[in-house]
């Protein structure tokens, strides 16, 4: 009876250790995924900022040209 309890205790202990190792690996994998999403989001934000600044530059040059032609100072 004692040997049976001892072996069950060892199995429980080993199962607990393997479960905690699996959880650590899963958490490490999830952290990598979050980093990738942040990088993608950062790249998309940079592209968006670049597009907005380019559009502002084009709009400003068009307004300058239009005001020059309206004032007949070109």
Curated annotation (Swiss-Prot):
Position of the signal peptide: 1-22
Keyword Signal among UniProt keywords: yes
Tissues showing expression: Expressed by the skin glands.
Residues excised as propeptide: 23-39
InterPro entries linked: Antimicrobial_frog_2, Frog_antimicrobial_propeptide
Keywords, in A-Z order: Amphibian defense peptide, Antibiotic, Antimicrobial, Cleavage on pair of basic residues, Cytolysis, Disulfide bond, Fungicide, Hemolysis, Secreted, Signal
Disulfide feature: 68-74
Subcellular location: Secreted
GO cellular component annotations of the record: extracellular region
A Pfam family this chain is assigned to: Antimicrobial_2
Protein's GO biological process: defense response to bacterium; defense response to fungus; killing of cells of another organism
Family (UniProt): Belongs to the frog skin active peptide (FSAP) family. Brevinin subfamily.
Job of this protein: Antimicrobial peptide active against a variety of Gram-positive and some Gram-negative bacterial strains. Has antifungal activity against a slime mold isolate. Has hemolytic activity against human erythrocytes.
Protein name, entry field: Brevinin-2CG1
């Amino acid at each position: 009876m004692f040997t049976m309890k001892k072996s069950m205790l060892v199995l429980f202990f080993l199962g607990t250790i393997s479960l905690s190792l699996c959880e650590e690996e899963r958490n490490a994998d999830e952290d990598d995924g979050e980093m990738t999403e942040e990088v993608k989001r950062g790249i998309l934000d940079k592209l968006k900022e670049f597009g907005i600044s380019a559009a502002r530059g084009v709009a400003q040059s068009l307004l300058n040209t239009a005001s020059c032609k309206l004032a007949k100072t070109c």
